[in-house]
Regions:
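Acyl-donor-binding surface of acyltransferase catalytic domains
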Residues: 1-37
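A short, internal acetyl-CoA/4′-phosphopantetheine-binding micro-motif in the GNAT/acyltransferase core
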Residues: 116-125, 152-153
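Short amphipathic alpha-helix that is part of the acyltransferase structural core
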Residues: 28-70
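Polar/charged side chains located within well-ordered beta-strands of beta-rich proteins
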Residues: 45, 60, 85, 98, ...
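Conserved acetyl-CoA pyrophosphate-binding loop and the N-cap/start of the following alpha-helix
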Residues: 123, 127-135
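Conserved GNAT acetyl-CoA-binding A-motif
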Residues: 140-153
Length: 173
């Protein structure tokens, strides 16, 4: 029985990967921005790349204490440029990331979902999460999408505040 469950789960993940591979193809602009955050420290906001995936996985594990889902890692290996925004420091080290994906059940809607936003601890409370979300919104603003959605727990004030500051409307579902 366990084997059948695992097989069915893998089939669902493959369906998600296939759907996202098609939907994300050439969906965003190639935009790079640089922001001064202190003396000699310049942060670069840019599209993700597969070469940064290991750094993103490690930062995610540090922040959320759980790894990224393996099927997401597989998807981002091929569609990092379309589905990931990152912030790197002067040494090309990832200090923040914004991960996106599409829901197959919403195939008829043009909505991309923000899955995770992570900012390294020493850079938190400096507005980088807000700037990263705003940067991501600009990259996807090509007229193809009807919207970007995000989820945050109602008691997660920090997440709700950064979402609101970056232009998201807060609704309770």
């Amino acid at each position: 029985m366990q084997f059948l469950h695992e097989l069915a789960e893998k089939a669902v993940h493959m369906k998600n990967i296939r759907f996202n591979m098609k939907r994300a193809y050439k969906i965003r602009r190639d935009l790079t921005e640089q922001v001064e955050v202190g003396e000699g420290v310049t942060l670069t906001f840019k599209r993700g790349e597969a070469k940064y995936l290991k750094q993103i996985e490690n930062l995610h594990l540090e922040l959320f204490r759980q790894p990224l889902y393996p099927w997401l890692v597989w998807l981002y290996r091929f569609r990092a440029k379309e589905l990931i925004s990152i912030v790197v420091d002067n040494n090309d080290k990832v200090i923040a990331y914004d991960l996106f994906f599409f829901q197959p059940v919403e195939a008829n809607q043009k909505v991309i979902h923000e899955l995770y936003v992570g900012v390294e601890y020493k850079y938190q409370d400096k507005g980088i999460g807000v700037k990263l979300r705003q940067y991501s919104s600009k990259c996807y603003d090509e007229g193809y999408l009807d919207g970007i959605s995000t989820l945050a727990a109602f008691d997660n004030i920090k997440a709700l505040r950064t979402a609101q500051k970056s232009g998201f409307a807060i609704t309770k579902t």
